[in-house]
Amino acid sequence: QPVSAILEAAEEHRADVIGMSGLLVKSTVIMKENLQELNQRKMAADYPVILGGAALTRAYVEQDLHEIYQGEVRYARDAFEGLRLMDALIGVKRGVPGAKLPELKQRRVRPSAAAAEVEERPQEGHVRSDVATDNPVPEPPFEGTRVIKGIQLKEYASWLDEGALFKGQWGLKQARSGDGPSYEELVETEGRPRLRGLLDRLQTDNLLEAAVVYGYFPCVSKDDDLIVLDEQGNERTRFTFPRQRRGRRLCLADFFRPEESGETDVVGFQVVTVGSRIGEETAKLFASDSYRDYLELHGLSVQLAEALAEYWHARVRAELGFAGEDPADVEDMFALKYRGARFSLGYGACPDLEDRAKIAEMLRPERIGVHLSEEFQLHPEQSTDAIVIHHPEAKYFNAR
């Protein structure tokens, strides 16, 4: 959403507060630019701003962005903290007795400039990391793509991360004072009963349309590039990934056989969706001002898409022959203690959203009702994509 559209809507609807959520790494830059635009338009004093999302941290918002914004800017960890902040901001704005904002996060003590320069001096060039290149390459069951539709909720519901849902999406937590029920008690008395009710409703109202398109492709790597090959062994498409400039100097390309080895590796891609109906239902709730119901159903829909992605990644590991290495405990599965990893576009190791167009060209996700917008966003919203890597050392990392 361009900032001009946000500001026009704020003026048209006489908004009290502007809220923005950033999921992707690029969002940190966009948020800063948006706040600077509010400054330039002399609108900062009129609009307090609440920021949140996976790409942002409280320190970044309440330290760095607070320093540049000429109005009030605060961080909300989730939608429920956002609602509490809204109450506080409105109370302060209207002069309600006793209304006040929570304290800003205090700035950390920074190292001296000289020490920081030595510590942060990056290495240059394409110096490869120490990732092993002699791991066995699994044999995929097929090359190309397959479409799977009609996946039942019971098949992937066990992959639903209740902790991420209850804490991250629904804001379920014990009172800060320590009084009242514990988090575990809240899970039993509120979380799981609400979850069961919503899951029953999703099935009764037929709101889920879970589907997957995925595939395996031959590939090699060269420097920071992953080169996907066609059936004749010629280059089909190429992904260029960022490399860490310090530490292990990891790059996603390192997890595939280098071109000079003469060997061919295999890479997986997947796009999953729980369909558009659940998004349409959340939109109805929002339009009817049923905000808590909206937040709960929307949060569940996001986590169900993630559960489907995890379920299908497990299917890929089975097809590649190493599902036996998966941990037995479900919490260890949620902690990603299995072999390999799936990397979604827009995050630290592969931040370039434009690469989604390359995945879309190979998988043709429109076959399961998923489309790519001009801004390289997946629609329906409750959809995810991923590069699936089999290498035993492949784990999440940030290339920044």
Q: PLM ranges: what are they?
A:
Residues 14, 38, 42, 278, ...:
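Alpha-helix capping/termination and helix-coil
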Residues 34-37, 63-68, 90-91, 174, ...:
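Short secondary-structure boundary/capping segments
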Residues 1-66:
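Cofactor-cradling patches in redox/metallo enzymes
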Residues 309-391:
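Structured, hydrophobic secondary-structure cores that serve as assembly/anchoring elements
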Residues 80-295, 299, 320-322, 355-356, ...:
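Active-site loops and adjacent core secondary-structure elements that bind or stabilize anionic groups
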Residues 73-78:
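Short acidic-hydrophobic, aromatic-tinged amphipathic segments that line or gate anion-handling sites
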Residues 293-315:
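C-terminal substrate/ligand-recognition segments
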Residues 47, 71-72:
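A structural micro-motif
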